[in-house]
Amino acid sequence: RKIAVKCAYENCFISINKIIYIESYQRKRIIYTKEQVYETGASLNDLLSLLPVEQFEMPQKSYIVNFDHVTSITKTKVILDYSTEIKLARDRMTNFNMKFQKYIRG
């Protein structure tokens, strides 16, 4: 399954399972995959609404992560493939951990 997002002057079709994480930086959202990095003006909430709710979550207000690419979770951060570390907000920690546990149990 893919999502369509407006990237620069064209529509990009991105495979959902290839998305590692999405970052909100300044006035754009950056979608990271293994092969490529995409930039879009869509909001994080708009992007989150296109993604499977059980597979994606926000560890803090500026990021969305794909549970398929989480390698570990500490009290303060989420570690993804390629040793990418994203801070885990204290007020989101419990919900994030519960949702991740539910996801890996299937």
Predicted regions and their residues:
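Eukaryotic intrinsically disordered, low-complexity regulatory linkers and tails enriched in Ser/Thr/Pro
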Residues: 1-9, 92-106
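Conserved binding/recognition cores within well-folded domains
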Residues: 1-87
